[in-house]
């Protein structure tokens, strides 16, 4: 079953390509990053040069891929999209690099997952526009150095710390994308609803934004599910009341936490006395993968002040303890009424 608040890319997101902004002007949020990128693009165009290599990092779902496509659009060049896990051999990367058109963009998502051997192919390509290919095998094999046309590499990662220093140092532009504000997300929801031809109240947009974990991808996914809910259970319009009842049915609370988030906090608070407790122990307690907890759930819980990461393990904050106690009380109260 798909996790509604998952900020990872899903197949459904492919079908909502129309929701992606195409220009910096339409791109909502990340104001400081946008201002800098706009200057870099204008300067590159005036010099008639490709944009310097760009590294975009930050939590999933914040618009790194969208921004890469916007940069290509603003530069008036083509973009080739691939990902770290998809490039399995050095030859795969060489083939991509030798087929890039002049001043075009190569976008590598999850660039931190590139194999180190493959990564080394990028070093001369990024610095000197050169790439080495080996022809033949054994003692008779020869290395030929090819010259590449000028190009821009845009790398995106959720784990900037996993990038090797030699690779990271070759990016001239490094920008972090941060979580969005409620106001920014509300604007994104309103824009998406307009594109989807979905009738929605401003208050409903704000309610969706509050529960979207600071992430546009989550906001758009909640909007699509509420569109279904409003169509089947109500008149089709998403009012504040419809949004609130739908989100409650989807078990997304006022902080944007879902059942898995609450399971993590409950385990720390009730099973381990509030912590500190190790990641592997939490994973075993709730039946979830360690990497999934660390990459998908923890960043938002830490950002919102529910969790603290210490050398001895994870610790639940007073905010988390109060929130979990409130949920338990509400569940007990509704059970007593029945």
Curated annotation (Swiss-Prot):
Record's protein name: Holliday junction branch migration complex subunit RuvB
Binding annotation for ATP: 19-20, 61, 64-66, 170, 180, 217
Keyword Kinase: no
Region of interest called Small ATPAse domain (RuvB-S), as start-end residue ranges on this chain: 181-251
Region (Large ATPase domain (RuvB-L)): 1-180
Region Head domain (RuvB-H), residue ranges: 254-338
Reaction it catalyzes: ATP + H2O = ADP + phosphate + H(+)
UniProt binding sites for Mg(2+): 65
Species annotation: Caldicellulosiruptor saccharolyticus (strain ATCC 43494 / DSM 8903 / Tp8T 6331)
